[in-house]
Regions:
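N-terminal auxiliary segments of SAM/dcSAM-dependent transferases
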Residues: 1-48
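Conserved alpha-helix/loop element of class I SAM-dependent methyltransferases that forms part
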Residues: 10, 30, 34-37, 51-75
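Conserved class I S-adenosyl-L-methionine
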Residues: 70-82, 100
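Helix-to-beta-strand junctions that scaffold the AdoMet/dcAdoMet cofactor pocket
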Residues: 71, 94-95, 166-170
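Short glycine-centered segments of the SAM/dcSAM-binding site in methyltransferase folds
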Residues: 75, 98, 170-172
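Conserved SAM-binding loop of SAM-dependent methyltransferases across substrates and taxa
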Residues: 82-96
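S-adenosyl-L-methionine
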Residues: 100-155
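C-terminal substrate-binding/active-site "lid" region of AdoMet-derived donor-dependent transferases
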Residues: 161-225
Length: 228
């Protein structure tokens, strides 16, 4: 299940819970849950169970993601933060870094702030449409990783525009391709191939494509490196 390089340093672990192997991250804020997840103590260290049916990043790890570009000190721009389920686990991993969490819906952003940002020193919420990236509050320099999980037909174009503005050279884009948001009439695999071609033509090299079934139907994660 767990093949992530540097998993121990990043606080990613597989733990047996009631006889079943479950993916976990070391909790940055002891005793605080984000989405009702189970908290487990191991040798005095608290971990949070990471549900792959609620987090596409967890699904990708279980489906064999080895090179997770997010390090303990990464600066991450997270597009489509929603209420902060995956954001919180990224915050656990990048505990010495920062997560700029972009969410466009004010009501959802309020939940993100209450559930996550209020408790976690390394999460900075940005209430803005990811298309209006030039309106983000000033960020301290460029980011190491952009994680994009937005259900829009032009999701890849939005990710590319944000990368051109904020991603370091040789930085990584982790793009969730939601094929049914792009075109319901085409085969999901052909849509993923089209989005990958779009990334290549904009200066990205593709490291990995992971299809997320059975956790998320018709979704894939693309790991791409910028101007490498």
């Amino acid at each position: 299940m767990l093949e992530v390089e540097g998993a121990e340093e990043k606080g990613i672990k597989v733990v047996k819970v009631e006889g079943e192997e479950r993916l976990c991250t070391r909790n940055l804020v002891d005793g605080v849950q984000v989405y009702g997840e189970q908290l487990i103590k191991i040798d005095g260290v608290e971990y949070r169970v990471w549900d792959p049916f609620r987090s596409k990043l967890a699904a990708a790890i279980i489906k064999g993601l080895k090179h997770l570009p997010i390090s303990v000190s990464s600066k991450v721009l997270y597009l489509g933060a929603s209420t902060g389920t995956t954001v919180s686990h990224v915050s656990d991993i990048a505990y010495k870094g920062v997560v700029y969490a972009v969410e466009s819906a004010p009501r959802v952003a309020r939940e993100l702030i209450e559930r996550v940002a209020k408790h976690r020193r390394n999460v900075i919420p940005i209430v803005e449409d990811a298309r209006r990236y030039e309106h983000y509050p000033a960020m301290a320099g460029k980011v190491d990783v952009i994680y994009c999980d937005i259900a829009q037909q032009d999701q890849t174009d939005i990710a590319i525009a944000n990368a051109k503005a904020y991603l370091k050279d040789k930085g990584y884009l982790m793009l969730i391709v939601k094929t049914r948001s792009i075109d319901v009439t085409k085969e999901p695999k052909s849509i993923v191939e089209e989005e990958v071609a779009k990334l290549r033509s904009n200066g990205f090299s593709i490291e990995k494509v992971i299809y997320l079934e059975p956790f998320d139907k018709d979704h894939a994660m693309v790991i791409a490196r910028y101007k490498s």
